[in-house]
Amino acid sequence: QAGDKVFFAFSFGPFLGFWTAFEAATELGCMALPGGGLSGAGRLGVMMENRVDALCCTPTYAAHLGEVARAEGVDVSAIGLRRIIVSGEAGGSIPATRERIETLWPGARVFDHHGMTEVGPVTHQCPAQAGVLHVLEEAYLPEIIDPKTAEPVAAGETGELVLTTLGRHGSPLIRYRTGDLVTAAESPCPCGRLDLALQGGI
């Protein structure tokens, strides 16, 4: 939210997710702090000095940075971190991975986010349920199909996520087969959102 300090543990490289998340944070009115080429200890120092509210990184790096803090004797609770937004690889919706990260960062909650280079940001974690991702239906028309027959699957069944982009002019995609296997939630989401909810992440 506006006024939050968000630390991005990425360098300004070709990873598209970093750029879109960094830009989104600044558009929201957050102070966006890039990690650049700092070491783990250096990044922890910046986080401590600025009392950051949120950390953006991959799930494995969130765990790694937490282990570095333990090894260095850094009291991460003094940072005041409240949210860890993970992307770039599977993990944030896997209960054991999420629990490990939240154990290493007491007081912080993990939020999973998923996207892809071909289409951009695709899902965000439900605020009411860990491990449930909502598709950004204002940007995509999602379908879930049987990867072998290309027929639609019922809610609760696992299938391949197919996306049609809405409003993209430079590189629109129609019924793009992502290769990602997902399971649509069988009941309405308690958060009240009507966007497609994916149970268990990607």
Regions found by a protein language model. Name each.
Residues A2-A32:
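Conserved AMP-binding loop of ANL adenylate-forming enzymes
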Residues L28-I202:
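Active-site glycine/GP-rich loop and adjacent strand/helix microenvironment
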Residues Q1, P14, E67-A71:
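Short, composition-biased local secondary-structure segments
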